[in-house]
Amino acid sequence: MRRLLLLLPLLFSPTATAQLPQITLTGIYPAGGQRGTSLDVTVTSGTDLDEATELLFSHPGLTATAKLDGNGNPISNRFLVSVDPGIEPGLYDVRLRGLFGISNPRLFVVDTIPEVVETELNNTSGQSQKITLNTTVNGRSDAAADVDTFQFSVESKQTIVIRSTAASLDSLMQPVLELYDGDGRRVAHSRRRQQQDAVIVYTSDDAQTLELKVHDTVYAGGNTYPYRISVDTRPQVDFVQPAIMQAGLQTDVRIFGRNIPGGQPTGLTIDHSPLLSKSVPVILPASDLQSIGTNSAASALDTCIYSGIDGNLVRFAIGPQAAHQPEKSPEEKRSPAQTVTLPASVSGSFAHELDEDVYRFSAKKGEVWLIDVLADRLGSTADPLLLVEQVTKDGEGNESFKRLAREESNRQNPGGNSLPTLTKDPSFQLTVPADGDYQVKLKDRYSVSRGAADMTYSITITKPKRDFRIVLFDSLPSADGKAPPATGAISLRKGGTYQIPVYAYRSGGHNDDIQISSANLPAGIQLSNATIPAGKSSTTVVLTASADAKELASFVQLTASSGAGDQKQDRPVTVATLVHAGANGLPRTGRVSGSLMVGVMKDEQPIHVLPGLQSAEVSQDQQLLVPIKLTRRTGFDDKVDIVFSGQPKNVDVPKVSIAKGQDSVVARFYFKDNVATGPSTLLMYATAQVPYKRNPWQVDRANQVAAQAEEGLKASAQSVVAARAAAESNAAKVVELANMLKTLEQQLVTQQASELATQAELKKAIAGQADANKQLVALQVKLSAAVSEKTPKNVNVDNAIKNLREATLAVNEAARPIADLSAKLKTLTKKIAANKKAVADRTLDITQAKSAVAKQQIRVETAKKAMAAAEAKVKLAEAAKKAAADSVKKAEAAAKPQNKNVRTIAVPIRVVVHLTPGKITVAVPGGGAIKKGASAEVKVTLARKNKFAGAVKLKLQLPNGESRVTSSEAEIAADGTEATLKLTAKADTAAGDIVNAVIRATGDFNGRKASFDAPITLKVTD
């Protein structure tokens, strides 16, 4: 698979551009998963996928949640799917819900073995993706000429089964499988045959690595070409006998296939592999879900796709089971016919070329037997030809054969060109002409060139039962009503309608009305025209959503009923969907869906028309006036055309338009005297070219995002201003702190110098004090000497006294600087201590200042970063603002009004036409002109019809609201043919033409009041 490309939300097909958008789903990937696991699933293709954020499954065991982006918003078209471990393997419906409603269903497969997703590049042998046995690969043919290759290992004598799944995925892929051995030789090959996908069963002689190549049959590819390949050792069931069973009742079923554990040889082969058989007990569940995926040609057949044999989906028909018997063995077929006892059920196959099977039975004159062959409807490739013959014998016992029917007889195709409901399977209701023997011959249409064991069929011969089946075609109406319905689902706009085709299969002589009802329609939704008239095989059901209906997606169950009392029959309504309109060599294809959903979208229906009546009973030769009311929305005010369909032949149908600015009109129908009697459904469509705005809410949301972006930009700009101011403030603070630090450092230098000077001065003072102390000591010595001289030994007393006095003075003088120095020393010591403290304080201040500068520098850097971040945020906000502005422009461009051809259906009118009692002719004088205040006598002549012999009353019938002319009443007696009416124009009325005037005759006929008309021309003149 090459790189996966997600689709843009808006995808349009050529037919869709002319109509209002409605979601359709054409591809999901992968289209299946293993139970008990979760997997990523992507919507790969579809139309009108806007805001698609819901996947809806037909079983509660399958759930999905939208993948989210980084902002927590759902990612369109991407989901996480969880598969409950208790869910049964098989096929399930999945739908997508978005802005434009709910989509058609696509198939999702649940299996039991591990799964992987194909990885590219794997187009050549050297690029083969390696897988293990018992694995399912989800792959896709991505483009033209895409070939996917896979490698896996097998053991000696091991048998493997390679199953492709594409038809069961609603895929356009038609897989071709090619298996190569370890030497590069192709050892097996298979391709899709009709409804059967390719299968390879291979037994390896040696342990080796095998290579599988997968491609489309015409090498096509794209998002609508998914496939699944299972490479495993599980059994391969090719067919079963019987293929018709009763639900809920255990039955021994003989399975035929390959790689069947415990299987017995049959002597036959399929694709060169031995065909084995084995008896197993089977109980078919009664759940409607089990019929999902059945071809629409079998939609009237009760079927079940059984998943009780791992790896296989086996299709059964459900019904009362007649005594079953297999066809004769090849040895037994040497006798001319196989005798069966009625009622009978026989399973057989066209095992070889020119294989013809003959079944003979005895019957009584007047008996009625339904001969029904099942092959195509159960997925077989056989195309049976049916021949019913009466067997007679002459007197000598020689047999002769009279043909009573051939294969084309009794085929029903109510879906016509819309839903493929025509089957190849023949059916014939035999009314036995005489007592005796009869025989049925069966052979394949192409028996001269083909035959195979799996070209199987089942034939039943049973008493016909008066019954019916209803199939609803869940689809999208065409834009113009001319093309057949397209793939779609019931998605209503508020105040709008939706039409759905419904088909009836009748059997056993059933010919009554069939009513369709629902017990669980959501609030605001109404179902109209829910009756298929007696003898009809189809109708159009109309659903209406009220203007105030809520947006929703709801599962709805419909029931069909017919008859009354003990004869009442209730049947579930089968839902069918269109898979392909015809592509890649595949025809227009439909299948059975397991559920019906009704959705109401956010959009409004621009126009809606409503007839003034929903039913009417008329006679041949009668006028019917239908008032029509128009509701305009979304500002639309131009002309609306009204067209009709469904009416029987020989009815004058009006061409009606509702003019600009008007909201009503009256439509005139005239049922001619040769119109067919019986019920019919009158469908009314309003068409107009409407200027349509696609998703205007997207503009509102875009504007809201733009406003938020603008506010975000303002906030970001303010953040920049604040961040810049903070950065500047912090930078200034750094300068201030740096200057302060410089001052502190200068002060520290000064204080340190002062401290040094003081210390030097102190040192000098200390030295001076020491000198003074020495001098004082010397003087004190001298004084002591002088004192000694004062002793008696000293004769020179006066001289001694003098010396003493001088020494004392010297000591005193010497002591004085010592005291001064001591005081100074104390002062210097204090000064030094103060200087040390100042130095320590400045040092601390400097340390703190440096720390403050560092911290402030960090603040500066932080502020710079904040400013840079704010500036970056501004740039992001500017980009967001620009992106939001661009989104607004894109949203406005997308929502710009574009002219769309809107076609909407009204609530249908059920009309019953009865035989007319007669025909009247009217002679109006003056061409119908009557002057104001004057009168005119009108002669009325009656011609009786259909054995009518009663009296009739006559009157002038005017449209509602018209009263300018009045009339007398008259009566034509039972034995009469003429009467006269007097018409009078009011004197004070307006002049002008009177349209849709008739003379109406009314009488009792066939148990009802029957009216019939004669149109007249009337004009009031001055």
Question: Where are the regions that the model predicts?
Answer:
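Short beta-strand segments of immunoglobulin-like
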Residues: I28-Q34, V240-Q246, L476, T487-L492, ...
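Short proline/glycine- and polar residue-rich coil/turn motifs
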Residues: D69-I75, G86, R192-Q196, S204, ...
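Short glycine/proline/serine/threonine-rich loop/turn segments at secondary-structure transition edges
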Residues: G86-D93, G221-T224, L289-D302, S449-A453, ...
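Predominantly extracellular/luminal regions of secreted and cell-surface proteins
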Residues: R106-L133, G308-P343, K465-I470
